[in-house]
Amino acid sequence: MNIQSVRGFHDILGKDAKKFRKISDTARKILKLYNFEEIILPVVEYAELFQRSVGETTDIVQKEMFVFEDRKGRKLALRPEGTAGTVRAFIQHKLYALRPYVKLFYEGPMFRYERPQAGRYRQFHQIGAEVFGVAEPHADAEIIKIVYDILQALGIKGVVVEINSLGCKKDREAYREALLNYLTGVKEELCSDCISRMDRNPLRVLDCKVETCKVAVREAPKMIDFLCDECREHYEKLKNYLKALDIPFRENYNLVRGLDYYTRTVFEAVSDELGLTLIAGGRYDYLVEELGGPPTPALGFALGVERLMLLLPDEEEKEEVYFVIPFGDVHEYALRVADILRKKGKVVEYSYRKGGLKKQLEFADKLGVKYAVIIGEDEVKNQEVTIKDMETGEQRRVKLSEL
């Protein structure tokens, strides 16, 4: 049997690895500008954490979590998302006692048992940010601005930020009843998953991607019409702040997100070209308290790295690499030359190939290096190196002391 990677678990190589690193570096740079601190989370948590936070009735908990038992029979899970673990850490380490509000970001692999397709894997990578302790809508606007800044910095075009408000608990209760009454009337048009969702969490029907369900809910009551005065004011202020920040957005009253913990603001940065959600997030003002912490308003976002990679072009970026070619027994000198160049911040490839100069230079050309550094006995004797520009063919001798 040839050993292959597990279905849905992928290697990231070459140009894709460069795209991955570009996304990570860009997001980290922008999060640093907003003064977020990094938190490094474990990939394994108690399954109960996600059942209580993400929601028992969600597809993630019902169908997609990788759950297993440890040797003591305790149910553990590979994390399907990062917010729940960050909230758990916020409570466990009493971060709420340190300052009035806390801003954290994380990066790493997540795991969901989904059908693999373009931009969607069973192991995928997310970068996310969370703000704890701020209830005001200007925090929502700033979180969305971070998302917009990341996409702009990556040069991703054709992205729209969709927003909605899910209100508070009282708003949700009134809306749930009205929505359930409506869905009962169109029940025959719904898929089997949505019929079962009606009893558990009817809001999830609005998030269904099946075309017949999309048509069925077009005339459904809108959450926006059930917002209390306070939640409506929060939502209107958010829209004003987004306009002030010149962030293009559109309202999507069917946007509910796939996780049960969201309240008030929810948003998605969507690629219309791919039909994929690239970055998503929202408020979860009750989650900290529901998991055993003090009442703490909170909000955040997560971006899917692999999905963003689909939108980045392949870059033929040639690094200024120095390829050191030793001839004969000159390794002591050649290794020292390579070390000197690296200490000066140069990228150096030391040749391990055997063969004549022609073969070595052909290999250097194949690697796409900028310079070949040729070292033979004559160069050692004169304490020099021969540097060849691989693009122009120009060749010159340089003293070791002048490198």
From Swiss-Prot:
Compartments, record wording: Cytoplasm
Keyword entries, A-Z: Aminoacyl-tRNA synthetase, ATP-binding, Cytoplasm, Ligase, Nucleotide-binding, Protein biosynthesis
Record-linked PROSITE patterns: AA_TRNA_LIGASE_II
Gene Ontology CC annotations of this record: cytoplasm
Listed GO MF terms: ATP binding; histidine-tRNA ligase activity
EC number assigned by the record: 6.1.1.21
Pfam families: HGTP_anticodon, tRNA-synt_His
CDD domains the record matches: HisRS-like_core, HisRS_anticodon
Catalytic activity: tRNA(His) + L-histidine + ATP = L-histidyl-tRNA(His) + AMP + diphosphate + H(+)
Biological process (GO), any one: histidyl-tRNA aminoacylation
Record Gene3D superfamilies: Anticodon-binding domain (3.40.50.800), Bira Bifunctional Protein, Domain 2 (3.30.930.10)
InterPro entries in the cross-refs: aa-tRNA-synth_II, aa-tRNA-synth_II/BPL/LPL, Anticodon-bd, Anticodon-bd_dom_sf, His-tRNA-ligase, HisRS-like_core, HisRS/HisZ, HisRS_anticodon
Subunit text: Homodimer.
Similarity annotation: Belongs to the class-II aminoacyl-tRNA synthetase family.
Identification of the protein by name: Histidine--tRNA ligase
The organism of origin for this protein: Aquifex aeolicus (strain VF5)
